[in-house]
Amino acid sequence: MPNLKHLLLLSCIGLSPACIDVPPLDDPPKEDPRSTPDADFTFTATPAQEQVLPGGTLDCGVQLAWTEAAGGAVTWNLVSPPAGIELQAYTLPQGETRATLSIRVGAGTVPGAYTLTLQGKSGSVTKQATLTVTVGKPGDLVVNWVVPTPGKAYTRGPLLLQFTVEGGAAEQVEILKDSTVLVKPTGSPYSFTWDTTSEAEGTYQLSIRATRGGAVFTSAPRTIIVDRTAPTVASFLPAKDAATVGVHESIRVTFSEPMNPLSVTEAAVGLKTGAGVAIPKSVSVSADGQVLTVTPNEPLAAPDTISVDLTTLVSNITDLAGNGVQTAPTWKFTVPSWLPLGGAISAVAGRTSAEDVILKVDREGRPVIAWSESDGSTRNIYVAKWSGAAWDMLGAPLSGLIALGTDAARPDLAIDASNRPVVVWDEATGNGEGRDVFARRWTGSTWTSLPYIPLVSSSQEYALRPQLVVGANEDLFFHATQHDGNNSKVRGFKLPSTGSAWIDLNPVHPTGHLNADSISVAAAGNSIFTAYSVYDDTASRRGVAVLANDASLLGGTTLGTDARVLSVAVDTTQRPWVSWVQSPAQAETDGMLYWARWEASGWSTPTLVSNNSTGNNSPSLALGAGTPHVLAWSGVAASERSILVSRWIDNSWKPMGLPISALTASGTPAFGPSVSMDANGQPVIAWTEADATSANVHVFRLNY
């Protein structure tokens, strides 16, 4: 009788790499020796045998992968192992990612099923994997595969099969293909080359059956996939002729089946700029082997047209059975200067027109927009916030008056200290020329009214173009132009953050200033700057006036002539910058865009910005902190009204690429841009653009 021997069967549970058969990979490069304490990691464990004799040793390979930064050394041990089974603690040195652990099984281990927990620890981070262990009965034979290894094996031709039988001599050994005998090999170690070329494509289960004294001992099964079908490219992204690709996007190619990662090289994919210059890149294959990702080493340049050429993949990249790709595509996509945030935005279905859009970026870096739009009977104010994937409407349509036919228009937005949007607008009262102003604050679920703003409204008196900013101490500052039928002037109020009523700021009215019209307000620190267009009787011209804290006319004079719509912003040194349209007759045809800034004791010389466009209108300024300032406006270039954008670089306004238009067809004019800086100091722009049926809001961000 042979000595009492036990059978040990181990298999990995929950370790998917141990159950996926791909060709063995060469050792990857060692990790950067610079380590991060408590770095996160994962590991896989693969036993070298599935059965082992008692008193013997089971070798188990482990492979380490750092989640992000590389960590230090990793110590391995078994957690509370059963009696007779032990692993001497082993430390994987810093910088290494592979090791072979030796698990000893004592000769006296009691037969039965056990659960082992293998643990790796680096710093304070521990990860575990579970192994099942079965100790067999005395007298059992040990049957182990050598090749194929655990998991799935792929073949398109001859396949080498090798295995061992230990623990005594077998009277008969058979290789089973599913339930039938494939061959009865002899000799030890046992070896057989299976020619699969005559087999039908499909999946087969192979196992080894050894017989002795009427007892049958069977190996663990091996899954063999016979595959002679060439893989194909199922899909790819970005799509052919895609027009809105981000500078950080990768190219993803999906195949019809898993590919051999060892057949994939960086040279297999061609990636070039529009000028034909090769783009440095890296390539990787997904864990399931079906997705090839091409990642440029640096962000793509914008604007540009990128070419992707996969023809080198043909016959070079193969599936796990060795079948090569027979055809592969080439295509192009465009990386524009600007990317849309969602598509066209409209609150009302049908042939409606959105107007007066205003954009602000909240304290979490998310754009918020407000605009006016008619539902066919009443024009309301709408507010929406970008979620990161879509525009979410904030509450119901806003109107200060309930009566049918009211007309809400010209909203403005501010974001308060609690990151809540506050919106103001003017609205027709239905009493002659009368218009009133209204203010609402978003609570997170609904809109609440702010205290009444004490402006007179009658059949001939009304307020227009309300402006709202958040100043020092998180106070709200409101300004508008008040018209009385004969004249108009700037009015201003403050709502303290802890107050319940608006305080009249009584803005100064310089002598000879008549008929104030377009208005823009900006805040910085303790300063509030109010810019407005006004007829300057002393200079006999309509110019731009800028008030500092509602109390003094900066520079003692107005700027420009024939001034119309304008925009003001404040830089980090609390200097106001102002841009305005000069138009002798009609801005939509003869408007010219100018700018100036305050230089401590006087204004810089007003300078023309719109050198390459006509019919300029609706400027919008946004000043960066550590990033270039931005000026956007609506103008006509190449016979199309678009949004033009310039950036302050090297002490001058320089165009940021080509004019922007959301619609590709001609005859789709873009109006009224509103620009703000995002959390990274980069511009986000909203405007309205019309086609033959309606006008919608569009929002774009810089592609950076």
Which ranges hold each PLM region?
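Extracellular, repeat-based ectodomains that mediate carbohydrate processing or recognition
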Residues: 163, 336-704
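Flexible, low-complexity linkers/stalks enriched in Thr/Pro that connect modular domains
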Residues: 134-138, 195, 222-231, 331-337, ...
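Short, surface-exposed alpha-helix to beta-strand junction/turn motifs within ectodomains of secreted
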Residues: 247-284, 313-318
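Short, surface-exposed loop/turn segments at beta-strand-coil junctions that are enriched for proline
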Residues: 104-111, 195-199, 299-301
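Short, solvent-exposed loop/linker segments at beta-strand-coil boundaries, enriched for Pro/Gly
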Residues: 79-89, 179-183, 241, 269, ...
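Long, low-complexity serine/threonine/glycine- and acidic-rich segments characteristic of extracellular
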Residues: 93, 98, 138-228, 309
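Short, compositionally biased P/S/T/A/G/V-rich stretches that sit at domain boundaries
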Residues: 31-36, 41-49, 137-154, 227-245
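Long beta-sheet-rich domains in secretory-pathway and surface-associated proteins
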Residues: 20-139
